[in-house]
């Protein structure tokens, strides 16, 4: 049985209080919400607000980062 804290294997992020921060391996396809307790699920925008993205706000992955082509979201 796959580790529920490892969404790279399961394809779903089931991170919760029961998943240790170091045990949840979230991949690029893992769209974790703000209520996700796993540190590995958190991503931040590494772009400037001039590009249309307020860094660290409502950015849960590359798909939600509304910036120029040089923008990237990273863990």
Curated annotation (Swiss-Prot):
Residues bound to Cd(2+) 2: 19, 24, 38, 41
Conditions for induction: By cadmium.
Any coiled-coil regions, as ranges: none
Give the molecular function GO annotations: metal ion binding
Q: Which residues carry this modification: N-acetylserine?
A: 2
Q: Which residues bind Cd(2+) 1?
A: 15, 19, 32, 36
Q: What is this protein called?
A: Metallothionein
């Amino acid at each position: 049985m796959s580790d529920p804290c490892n969404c790279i294997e399961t394809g779903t992020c089931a991170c919760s209080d029961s998943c240790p921060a170091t045990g949840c391996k979230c991949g690029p396809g893992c769209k974790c919400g703000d209520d996700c307790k796993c540190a590995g699920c958190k991503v931040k925008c590494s772009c400037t607000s001039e590009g249309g993205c307020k860094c660290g706000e409502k950015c849960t992955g590359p798909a939600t980062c509304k910036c120029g082509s040089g923008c990237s979201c990273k863990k």
